[in-house]
Each structure stands twice: as C-alpha cells, then as structure tokens.
Amino acid sequence: MASGNAHIGKPAPDFTGTAVVDGAFKEIKLSDYRGKYVVLFFYPLDFTFVCPTEIIAFSDHAEDFRKLGCEVLGVSVDSQFTHLAWINTPRKEGGLGPLNIPLLADVTKSLSQNYGVLKNDEGIAYRGLFIIDAKGVLRQITVNDLPVGRSVDEALRLVQAFQYTDEHGEVCPAGWKPGSDTIKPNVDDSKEYFSKHN
C-alpha cells in the first residue's frame, strides 16, 4: 500500500476525473463539492463480489447522506466504460442497476496512489473510506483489506458525529449516535458526562 498524500486534519487531495453520474459520463472534481461533506470510498474492481454489496448499500442510503449535506462518491481503477457496463447489468446478475451516486474512474491509478490505498502488486485499490468536511479537510480514514466490506451505517454515524462536534464544540464518546450524550472537552465539565455514565 502506498503512503499517499491524504492526512487527517489537512486538506484532502483534490482530483478531477470522469465519473458515471445518472448513466452518463461527467467530469467531476473534489472542489465541486466544497461546502458539503463528502464520503469518498475506494473499492477494488467492478464485476466482483463484495464490491456491489457496498456500492448498492451506499447508493440506497444516498438520500440519508444528502439530508446531512453530504455526497457519496465511489472510486475504482476501472474505466468509466466498465462502470457503465456494470451499472447496466441487473442486480440479480451481479450488476449494480441504476445508482444514486457517482462512480469515478481511476484508470491511471493516480487517485488511489494519492489517497494511499493502491495495492501496488495488483494495481487495484484497497477498501479505503475518507470523510471530507465542508471545508475540504480530511476528517476520517479507514482502510479495509480486500475481503471485508464496510458499514454504511457507521459511515453515516461518523458524518453525523463530525458535524455535531463542528457545530457544538463538544466531543462524541464511543458509539455515539444523534441524540446521545456528548462530552464537554475540559477537565471540570467532562465530569458531568462521566458521573452520569459510570
């Protein structure tokens, strides 16, 4: 896996590329999404086995993310033509069917390399997931090995948690969900949380 240029708390590496959006090819840039949160997820290859389960799950929850002012973008090293062929394949045959999220082509592998998820020996991406805030700052990175898919619910929860901390200045404990107690991040005020939960 390459080291990449994606670092927590720093601006996310910008990119421009061709994506399949609503069944058509479209040039997109990360900077197009400034002012919104972005969940950028990499997956190994089209026409595989775990990948469609993740992509369909993210697509099926796209509106949940949009309600939070967040867009979801999928990326693999496949071409936009392969993405389109997979989208045009019915789900019952291992295809994706119509999607509610863009799939970005990274045929040069530069995006995977830049984000540090390129599996050099195979020329494919690990299952990297990056949460980028409305200012373009990278807030979260997770990278799974190839055989295990990611949780869309956890990605949604993380976006909600980062947005909450940005708005309220409090921090979110393990397993936090919207409506749960948070912690005031100083020694004295944090005792309110700890006395209630211990």
UniProtKB/Swiss-Prot annotation:
Catalytic function, reaction form: a hydroperoxide + [thioredoxin]-dithiol = an alcohol + [thioredoxin]-disulfide + H2O
Keywords from the UniProt entry: Acetylation, Antioxidant, Cytoplasm, Disulfide bond, Oxidoreductase, Peroxidase, Phosphoprotein, Redox-active center
EC number, UniProt record: 1.11.1.24
Keyword check for Acetylation: yes
GO cellular component, one term: cytosol
Segments forming domain Thioredoxin: 6-164
Domain of life: Eukaryota
Residues with the Phosphoserine modification: 112
Positions of modified residues (N6-acetyllysine): 196
Post-translational modification: The enzyme can be inactivated by further oxidation of the cysteine sulfenic acid (C(P)-SOH) to sulphinic acid (C(P)-SO2H) instead of its condensation to a disulfide bond. It can be reactivated by forming a transient disulfide bond with sulfiredoxin SRXN1, which reduces the cysteine sulfinic acid in an ATP- and Mg-dependent manner. Acetylation increases resistance to transition to high molecular-mass complexes. Deacetylated by HDAC6 which decreases reducing activity.
Keyword Repressor: no
Gene3D superfamilies found in the cross-reference section: Glutaredoxin
Cross-referenced Pfam families: 1-cysPrx_C, AhpC-TSA
Enzyme class of the recorded protein, top EC level: oxidoreductase
InterPro entries found in the cross-reference section: AhpC/TSA, Peroxiredoxin, Peroxiredoxin_AhpC-typ, Peroxiredoxin_C, Thioredoxin-like_sf, Thioredoxin_domain
Modified residues (N-acetylalanine): 2
CDD domains noted in UniProt: PRX_Typ2cys (cd03015)
Subcellular location: Cytoplasm
Location of Phosphothreonine modifications: 182
Any GO MF annotation of the entry: thioredoxin peroxidase activity
Subunit record text: Homodimer; disulfide-linked, upon oxidation. 5 homodimers assemble to form a ring-like decamer. Interacts with TIPIN.
Family affiliation: Belongs to the peroxiredoxin family. AhpC/Prx1 subfamily.
Further remarks about this protein from its record: The active site is a conserved redox-active cysteine residue, the peroxidatic cysteine (C(P)), which makes the nucleophilic attack on the peroxide substrate. The peroxide oxidizes the C(P)-SH to cysteine sulfenic acid (C(P)-SOH), which then reacts with another cysteine residue, the resolving cysteine (C(R)), to form a disulfide bridge. The disulfide is subsequently reduced by an appropriate electron donor to complete the catalytic cycle. In this typical 2-Cys peroxiredoxin, C(R) is provided by the other dimeric subunit to form an intersubunit disulfide.
Summary of the function given for this chain in its UniProt record: Thiol-specific peroxidase that catalyzes the reduction of hydrogen peroxide and organic hydroperoxides to water and alcohols, respectively. Plays a role in cell protection against oxidative stress by detoxifying peroxides and as sensor of hydrogen peroxide-mediated signaling events. Might participate in the signaling cascades of growth factors and tumor necrosis factor-alpha by regulating the intracellular concentrations of H(2)O(2).
Protein name: Peroxiredoxin-2
Gene: Prdx2
